Amino acid sequence: LDAAFEGLTRAKENAEANLQNARELFERSVKRIFSDLVSTHSTTKLSDVTSKITKGSSPKWQGISYVDSPGVLFVTSENVGKNQLLLEKTKYVEEAFNQKDKKSVLAKGDVLTNIVGASIGRTAVYDINDVANINQAVCLMRCLPDRLLPNFLSYLLNSPYFKARLHDGESNMARANLSLTFFREFEVPLPNVREQQKTVDQIDLLASAADECEAQYTTKLTDIADLRQSLLQKAFAGELT
């Protein structure tokens, strides 16, 4: 039994190491992609390639109540994941909110970034058609379609390259909040739209491969935990000799 547990412990450590390596390899690859783009292309202020950079507000400030669906989908920082929306838990507000705060009514393709709290800098594209608005912890960036692709910007803002810029080279520094001015002045590497799409496709492939590896090693860790539990149960039941 001791030998079996030792083997399971080694297998668990190897799976955890491989899982971490898969994540780090993806991050390093994305960082290299954007670093190469910066070295080979000029940069442009984000305000020059977007039609809007703004943030939302609190319904309470506007005298607006939360409601059950249907209503206006109210996107908060909890709903903005890394390159994906997280809509398992959603909130809705009265339709009047969109009349009172028109500037932050969402359109499909808007890029959303968290600007307050632990998830600061986390970015996703609003890729659904629901009528929606955002709160004060989320920044909205609307790209000029002939200059900047939303998915390119989302990958850029989630990349280690951006994190280094965000923290002035100190990747472990905490930052309390980001201002709209920060984003308006932020310099983005700007290849043409065709090259941007190639970059998005390249990162999509890397992300798919990383997700597949993570799924395999996560499943392996679950199997190891289940096997350990099964051995313990058999040992307590006296079924092992």
Q: What residue spans do the PLM features occupy?
A:
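A short glycine-rich beta-alpha junction/loop motif
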Residues: 65, 115-116, 131-139, 148-151, ...
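Interdomain signal-transducing alpha-helices
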Residues: 153, 157, 196-199
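Non-catalytic DNA-recognition/assembly elements of restriction-modification systems
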Residues: 3-6, 10, 14-58, 185-197, ...
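Sequence-specific dsDNA recognition surfaces
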Residues: 47-64, 78-108
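Short hydrophobic-aromatic micro-motifs
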Residues: 73-76, 112-114
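Short, ligand-facing micro-motifs at secondary-structure edges
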Residues: 59-60, 81-92, 111-135, 151-155, ...
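Glutamine-centric residue-chemistry signal
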Residues: 136, 163, 175, 196-197, ...
